[in-house]
Regions:
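A short acidic (Asp/Glu
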Residues: 18, 64-65, 166-168
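Surface-exposed cleft-lining segments at the edges of enzyme active sites
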Residues: 17-30, 86-93
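Alpha-helical scaffolding segments of alpha/beta enzyme cores, especially the outer helices
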Residues: 31-45, 68, 72-75, 101-108, ...
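Active-site groove signature of glycoside hydrolases
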Residues: 1-26, 152-156
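Substrate-binding cleft of secreted/luminal carbohydrate-active enzymes
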Residues: 77-78, 82-178
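Short, hinge-like loop/turn segments at secondary-structure boundaries
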Residues: 24-25, 70-72, 99, 172-174
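Aromatic-lined carbohydrate-recognition surfaces of secreted/lumenal glycan-active proteins
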Residues: 7-11, 28-67, 112-123, 157-159
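Substrate-binding cleft/loops of secretory-pathway carbohydrate-active enzymes
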Residues: 51-89, 130-131
Length: 178
């Protein structure tokens, strides 16, 4: 038994990346990318088979606010996981079309890394209640991303909320991304 993967969960600036660009040579995007490169080089030197992944903010302009450039990060990470939490309060207003578009945006921009869409297992209500989803509802969401986007997988957030469906075989007929 050993380590199969390492996930970088909060590899970003907290919405203020544009304030951390003291020169053309030193930028927020450069810092995040360099950290990915250093982690990649250190981990792959020990075990080239370890999967490296990172959670990314879902905004298309994540470079400006968070220092996350999927094109650059995708050179060093195996999987990019945009947090497409479209059932959550902050993103619900954007709707499903936005969510599917985010998955495609990251899949196109983040190559050669694969993209797994980060989806929630719960919904936020207008009264700030967190309501767990049943397995069928979560499966329906996952199926939409499998059938309608370039994403090659999903990540479900958050363990302990919602009923986890059987996702085995969901991507079996979808060609692997190159």
């Amino acid at each position: 038994m050993g380590v199969d993967g390492i996930h970088l969960d909060y590899i970003r600036f907290g919405g203020t990346a544009y304030k951390h660009n003291p020169s053309e040579e030193i930028t927020a995007v450069g810092c995040v990318t360099e950290f990915c490169r250093q982690i990649h080089d250190a981990v792959k030197a020990v075990n080239p088979g370890i999967v490296l992944s990172a959670a990314l903010m879902p905004e298309p302009d994540s470079e400006y606010y968070y220092g996350q450039d999927p094109a650059q990060m995708g050179q060093y990470l195996d999987i990019l996981m945009p947090m497409i939490y479209y059932h959550s309060e902050g993103y619900r207003k954007n709707g499903l079309k936005w969510a599917l578009g985010v998955a495609d945006h990251f899949a196109k921009k983040g190559s050669p890394a694969r993209v797994w869409a980060g989806l929630t297992t719960y919904e936020d209500t207008d009264t700030a209640q967190v309501v767990p989803m049943d397995a069928e509802r979560i499966l329906q969401d996952c199926r939409m991303f499998a059938d309608s986007t370039l994403a090659t997988g999903v990540v479900l957030f958050r363990y302990g909320l919602g009923e986890l469906p059987d996702l085995n075989g969901l991507w079996k007929d979808k060609p692997a991304a190159k």
